[in-house]
Structures are given as structure tokens and as C-alpha cells.
Curated annotation (Swiss-Prot):
One of its GO terms (molecular function) is 4-(cytidine 5'-diphospho)-2-C-methyl-D-erythritol kinase activity. This is 4-diphosphocytidyl-2-C-methyl-D-erythritol kinase. The active site is at 9, 140. One of its GO terms (biological process) is isopentenyl diphosphate biosynthetic process, methylerythritol 4-phosphate pathway. It comes from Salmonella paratyphi B (strain ATCC BAA-1250 / SPB7). It catalyses: 4-CDP-2-C-methyl-D-erythritol + ATP = 4-CDP-2-C-methyl-D-erythritol 2-phosphate + ADP + H(+).
Length: 282
């Protein structure tokens, strides 16, 4: 049995710069990983079978991103003659990241499967090939595959590695799940934030264009942010529902965590520019 980190991410800022004819939104965002997340346990099989041993309530196994990622890797590697005969896996997950939380849990799980099985099966696919497979599963998967903090443009697929300060964060889940389309389909979502260079953006105060909609539509998000903002600069991550406050030290973050109201599910984690998954591979 092998054990593989599947870390969370934060969007340190997120700006919606337009909407394409196909309905997808163009954006500028800054991804950073957390030293906190799910863990995947993978046992290679030799009969070509993929088994997910920890099903998710309400999600058919074949629809789960973990299984879809494994099958896609199997297909691409097989078609290019790089899949050893009988390659398969038993996969289980220790889930800590909430669904619909804006922490990238599902995308991170898919990326960890691609990276881990490519390694365990010895397929030899390049990072670019794995990222291309990942993009077909979700716009956030490639950044997890590449494993470095990044400035993202387009629909999130154009990635430039960056090294923002590695701060400490108090991340709070307000107890609701926000499906991404709920935010992106809202007619009041800002969709015309001017594009700026990464150098300019890094000098500006960070914000998230989705936050105003999430706060308006989900009172729990509004309450969580209102509480966090009493202590430190705080924002929504992704389309929510998680919010986060940033601190210079772990002790400062933990002091605030101790005062968190009971209805708020919160944790402290460090921002890291190299994914914990990729640290394992070094």
C-alpha cells in the first residue's frame, strides 16, 4: 500500500475578466497549495481492474473523479503503448476536504491519481501529458498535476509558476456547499474586471470577484467572513464556500482558531508553493 497527499489549494485572488461564447468565464487567479488535505491510499493490482474502496455518498463510482482519472490515464497510456499489461489499482481515500468548499478537493484527488499511477505503473507520461489529461477532467486539475503555485489565466488552464509569500491561514467552512454554477450563473457576478499583469496584481490588495455573490446568496458565508474579518484580512476561496484569513505566524492563526464559534468548522494550515504531493516525489 502506498500513501499519496492530495492537498488543498487557495485562490489568493480571483478576478473574472470576461465570458466566452461557450459560456465559460475567463479569469485571473493565484493558486497556492496548503500543507493540508486528503490522503489517497493506492495498492497496485495486476489484473487491469480499478476499484475505489471508499465510495462517496450520492456519487456513482464510475462518475467519481478518482475513477475517471485512473481510467483516462489507463486509456491514454494504453493507446500510446506505455501501459504495462495488467496495470490496475485498489484506491481508497481519507477525506478531509469538503465538497463544494472551493479548496479544490475533487481536482486535487484526480491529479494525485494521475501522478501516482503514472509513477506506480511506470507509464512514463510527461507532466505536460498528465496536465492535458487533467484539463479534460476539470480546469483546476492541471495546477495540482504541475505541483507549483501559479498565476492562472484563460479559463484557468494558462499557468505561470510564481512564488507568493508562504503565510499561515485559518481556513473556515461555514457548513454549506456551493456548486460552482450557482455563482457563475448569477447575473450580478462581476464579469468585466480589467486584465492586469501578474506584477501589478501582486502589488494590489487581493480580492475575489465571487465573494459578493457568495455572501449575498449564502448567509453562512457572510457570517463566517464577518467573523474572520474582525481578526485579519480574509477572503473567499474559489467560488466558496470556504473562507480564509491570513497570518504571519502559526501562533497568531491558532489563537484566533481557539475563538472560533462552534458552528464554524475551521483549521490552520501553511501556504506552500511546492505541492506536498510533489515533495513526496523528490
Amino acid at each position: 500500500m502506498t500513501h499519496w497527499p492530495s492537498p488543498a489549494k487557495l485562490n489568493l485572488f480571483l478576478y473574472i475578466t470576461g465570458q466566452r461564447a461557450d459560456g465559460y468565464h475567463t479569469l485571473q487567479t493565484l493558486f497556492q497549495f496548503l500543507d493540508y488535505g486528503d490522503t489517497l491510499h493506492i495498492e497496485p493490482r495486476h489484473d487491469g481492474e480499478i476499484h475505489l474502496l471508499t465510495p462517496v455518498n450520492g456519487v456513482e463510482n464510475e462518475d467519481n473523479l478518482i475513477v475517471r482519472a485512473a481510467r483516462l490515464l489507463m486509456k491514454v497510456a494504453s493507446e500510446s503503448g506505455r501501459l504495462p499489461t495488467g496495470s490496475g489499482a485498489d484506491i481508497s481515500i481519507e477525506k478531509r476536504l469538503p465538497m463544494g468548499g472551493g479548496l479544490g478537493g475533487g481536482s486535487s484527488n484526480a491529479a494525485t491519481v494521475l501522478v501516482a499511477l503514472n509513477h506506480l505503473w511506470q507509464c512514463g507520461l510527461s507532466v505536460d501529458e498528465l496536465a492535458a489529461i487533467g484539463l479534460t477532467l476539470g480546469a483546476d486539475v492541471p495546477v495540482f498535476v504541475r505541483g507549483h503555485a501559479a498565476f492562472a489565466e484563460g479559463v484557468g488552464e494558462i499557468l505561470t509558476p510564481v512564488n507568493p509569500p508562504e503565510k499561515w491561514y485559518l481556513v473556515a467552512h461555514p457548513g454549506v456547499s456551493i456548486p460552482t454554477p450557482v455563482i457563475f450563473k448569477d447575473p450580478q457576478l462581476p464579469r468585466n474586471t480589467p486584465k492586469r499583469s501578474i506584477d501589478t496584481l501582486l502589488k494590489c490588495e487581493f480580492s475575489n470577484d465571487c465573494e459578493v455573490i457568495a455572501r449575498k446568496r449564502f448567509r453562512e458565508v457572510d457570517a463566517a467572513l464577518s467573523w474572520l474579518l474582525e481578526y485579519a484580512p480574509s477572503r473567499l476561496t474559489g467560488t466558496g464556500a470556504c473562507v480564509f484569513a491570513e497570518f504571519d505566524t502559526e501562533s497568531c492563526a491558532r489563537q484566533v482558531l481557539e475563538q472560533a464559534p462552534e458552528w464554524l468548522n475551521a483549521f490552520v494550515a501553511k501556504g506552500v508553493n511546492l505541492s506536498p504531493l510533489h515533495r513526496e516525489l523528490l
